[in-house]
Amino acid sequence: MASYLTLFISAVVVNNYVLTRFLGLCIFFGVSKNLNASVGMGMAVTSVITMSSILAWVVYHFVLIPFNLTFLKTVVFVLLIASFVQLLETIIKKQAPALYNMWGIYLLLIATNCIVLAVPILNADSNFNFLQSVVNAIGSGLGFAMAIILMASLREKLRLADVPKPLEGLGVAFILAGMLALAFLGFSGMISI
């Protein structure tokens, strides 16, 4: 049980995909202008990462390994992720049209988000068992959600600040992201998997 907790904390904080590995920055910068959209996107990315990792683990261990097709891992994982995101898009469009309109193109970008693909690939490369893969996926998704919510909170506070004209928009967003990354750098080396 302790190893699963360690893996979870490592995925959320120590090896945060956005702030330590710099993956998924397109959605991170694009959606973090609005806190509500960021919370929803964090939940969506977490669910997509988790479900994609579960599907990828099953396909990898019951199809690709037995038939010696592991070289197709990336292509198969991309197809699984794209299919799941398409399903999620259809559900959100029907059930929550306001959220669907708020996210815009970023919902489809989840399918091509490098975090969503990196987690199942790293799970496979790390030879994680099923439960380890699920724990790592949930932790990675929640780490992304935490990072984007922190960023959105800071960006909303900055709307009230007097930001120099050349730094408005993405300029100050990159500075904020760098400061967050430096803060999370302090956790590096605390947990090794």
UniProtKB/Swiss-Prot annotation:
PANTHER family named in the record: INTEGRAL MEMBRANE PROTEIN OF SOXR-REDUCING COMPLEX (PTHR30335), ION-TRANSLOCATING OXIDOREDUCTASE COMPLEX SUBUNIT A (PTHR30335:SF0)
Record-level GO BP terms: electron transport chain
Membrane-related topology note: Multi-pass membrane protein
Role noted for this protein: Part of a membrane-bound complex that couples electron transfer with translocation of ions across the membrane. Couples electron transfer from reduced ferredoxin to NAD(+) with translocation of H(+) out of the cell. Essential for energy conservation during autotrophic growth. Contributes to ATP synthesis during heterotrophic growth.
UniProt subunit comment: The complex is composed of six subunits: RnfA, RnfB, RnfC, RnfD, RnfE and RnfG.
Entry's Gene Ontology cellular component terms: plasma membrane
Compartment annotation: Cell membrane
Pfam families the record matches: Rnf-Nqr
Chain segments annotated as transmembrane: 11-31, 39-59, 62-82, 102-122, 134-154, 171-191
Principal EC category: translocase
EC number in record: 7.1.1.-
Protein name: Proton-translocating ferredoxin:NAD(+) oxidoreductase complex subunit A
NCBIfam families from the UniProt entry: rnfA
Keyword DNA-binding appears in the UniProt entry: no
InterPro entries reported for this sequence: Ion_transpt_RnfA/RsxA (IPR011293), NqrDE/RnfAE (IPR003667), NqrDE/RnfAE_oxidrdctase (IPR050133)
Protein family membership: Belongs to the NqrDE/RnfAE family.
UniProt keywords, alphabetically: Cell membrane, Electron transport, Membrane, NAD, Translocase, Transmembrane, Transmembrane helix, Transport
